[in-house]
UniProtKB/Swiss-Prot annotation:
<keyword id="KW-0067">ATP-binding</keyword>
<keyword id="KW-0436">Ligase</keyword>
<keyword id="KW-0547">Nucleotide-binding</keyword>
<dbReference type="GO" id="GO:0006434">
    <property type="term" value="P:seryl-tRNA aminoacylation"/>
</dbReference>
<keyword id="KW-0963">Cytoplasm</keyword>
<dbReference type="InterPro" id="IPR010978">
    <property type="entry name" value="tRNA-bd_arm"/>
</dbReference>
<dbReference type="InterPro" id="IPR042103">
    <property type="entry name" value="SerRS_1_N_sf"/>
</dbReference>
<comment type="subunit">
    <text>Homodimer. The tRNA molecule binds across the dimer.</text>
</comment>
<dbReference type="GO" id="GO:0016260">
    <property type="term" value="P:selenocysteine biosynthetic process"/>
</dbReference>
<dbReference type="GO" id="GO:0005737">
    <property type="term" value="C:cytoplasm"/>
</dbReference>
<comment type="similarity">
    <text>Belongs to the class-II aminoacyl-tRNA synthetase family. Type-1 seryl-tRNA synthetase subfamily.</text>
</comment>
<dbReference type="GO" id="GO:0005524">
    <property type="term" value="F:ATP binding"/>
</dbReference>
<keyword id="KW-0648">Protein biosynthesis</keyword>
<dbReference type="InterPro" id="IPR002317">
    <property type="entry name" value="Ser-tRNA-ligase_type_1"/>
</dbReference>
<dbReference type="Pfam" id="PF00587">
    <property type="entry name" value="tRNA-synt_2b"/>
</dbReference>
<dbReference type="InterPro" id="IPR002314">
    <property type="entry name" value="aa-tRNA-synt_IIb"/>
</dbReference>
<feature type="binding site">
    <location>
        <position position="390"/>
    </location>
    <ligand>
        <name>L-serine</name>
    </ligand>
</feature>
Length: 427
């Protein structure tokens, strides 16, 4: 959530940064208009309250000075006091309604792109930062798409999964299930060694949690919801892990806090009809290891670069070619102020595909979720900065392995770092 003070003090800057996302999509003037009304009411209420207090003192003084408690003078003051009390009572719901309107409009505004984020309208204007692993790209021809080699090996079952659920689901069989488990354990082990503390959070989460990280109210149609409870299936571990600290004041000396978490993730993929209808790239249910950070504002830029490096380390250990993109303003996620995407090489399509997004949300999520910190010896509190990134999406990592490690004889080599987990060299 954006700070209303920022909108008041720098309306032109805020509107320009929002327009950098999508011109004309977001307007702050309606919020500022309501804010003026709300502050005017606050001023009226303060004046009325001051007069009410003054009347109370006057009545006491006059009675103490000998005035008749039932006399006309005291009655007049009491009548004015009662009139003020009624006005205050009438103002309360008006002020409450204005605050609610402002809050809801602020919830609908995305984060401001960082000044360093390149300005652009869509993904075609993202900026490539670097590539890694060109020497690891496979040279053999006729590489099958991962879903074909997976079905040939009997480790990916799509057709029967439709019978169990619907399209965009998969069952992993035999070595496929073992590979998924190996990837999860390997990724967690690597991130724990890098200083992250593992969490196994709930995967059913409430609306307040989704609001705290920015999925609600704007993206309700993209998540699965339980019919009879205020519970949703988590779209990413970012949501429950971030909200573990909702409405808490942390000690500055305990920052930064690093967490890693494996969870299944659930997404309706609304608006993706016809895209990636085959394979593991776009499923309704998939597994992911997520990295979440809570950091001091002064270190968040450096922590962001370290987060990207933590995600890259997994791809490098697996020797999977990838590239890093800095997202332009028009392609940023709703809550992100700055974001890097890691894209892994899929040789069957001769292209790179996203496997991790590493975002710095600055104080946007913390302001929505009420996550603050206090520094010893200083008054007041500040909002923490939150960051998160995939480390990595398991299904997409499996897809990349099935293609990049494909052998001419129809087998798939197991990456060396996974062999101790799988106890085999080939699938």
């Amino acid at each position: 959530m954006l700070d209303i003070k920022l909108l008041r003090e720098n309306p032109t800057l805020v509107q320009e940064r929002l327009d950098a996302r999508k011109a004309g999509e977001y307007a702050i003037q309606p919020i500022l208009d309501l804010d003026i009304q709300q502050r005017t009411l606050e001023g009226d209420r303060s004046q009325l309250q001051a007069r009410s207090n003054e009347i109370g003192k006057l009545i006491g003084q006059k009675i103490k000075g000998g005035a008749d408690p039932k006399g006309e003078e005291i009655a007049t003051l009491k009548a004015e006091g009662n009139e003020i009390k009624q006005k205050l009572a009438d103002l309360e719901p008006q002020e409450k309604e204005l605050k609610a309107q402002i809050y809801n409009l602020l919830l609908a505004l995305p984060n401001l792109p960082d000044q360093s984020t390149p300005v652009g309208t869509n993904e075609t204007e993202n900026v490539e930062v670097r590539r890694w692993g060109e020497a690891h790209k496979p040279t053999n021809e006729n590489i099958l798409p991962h879903w074909e080699i997976g079905e040939q090996l009997g480790i990916l079952e799509f057709a029967r999964s439709v019978k169990v659920a619907q399209s965009r689901f998969v069952s992993l069989v035999g070595a496929g299930a073992a590979l998924e488990r190996a990837l999860i354990n390997f990724m967690l082990d690597q991130q724990i060694a890098a200083g992250y503390v593992e969490v196994m959070p709930p995967v059913l989460i409430n609306s307040d949690s989704l609001t705290g990280t920015g999925q609600l109210p704007k993206f309700a149609e993209e998540s699965f919801r339980c019919a009879d409870d205020d519970l949703w299936l988590t779209p990413t571990a970012e949501v429950p892990v971030t909200n573990l600290y909702r409405y808490e004041i942390l000690e500055a000396e305990n920052l930064p806090i690093y967490h890693c978490a494996y969870t299944p993730c659930f997404r309706r993929e609304a608006g993706s009809y016809g895209k990636d209808t085959r394979g593991l790239i776009r499923l309704h249910q998939f597994n992911k290891v997520e990295l979440v950070k809570f950091v001091h504002p002064e270190t968040s830029a450096a922590e962001h670069e370290k987060l990207v490096a933590n995600a890259e380390a997994i791809l490098q250990a697996l020797k999977l070619p990838y590239r890093v993109l800095e997202l332009c303003s028009g392609d940023l996620g709703f809550s992100a102020g700055k974001c890097y995407d890691l894209e892994v090489w899929l040789p069957s399509a001769d292209t790179y595909r996203e496997i991790s997004s590493c975002s710095n949300f600055y104080d946007f999520q913390a302001r929505r979720a009420g996550i603050r910190f206090k520094e010893a010896g200083k008054k007041g509190t500040q909002f923490v900065h939150t960051l998160n990134g995939s480390g990595l999406a398991i299904g997409r990592t499996m897809a990349a392995i099935l293609e990049n490690y494909q052998q001419p004889n129809g087998t798939v080599a197991v990456p060396e770092v996974l062999r101790p987990y799988l106890k085999r060299d080939f699938l």
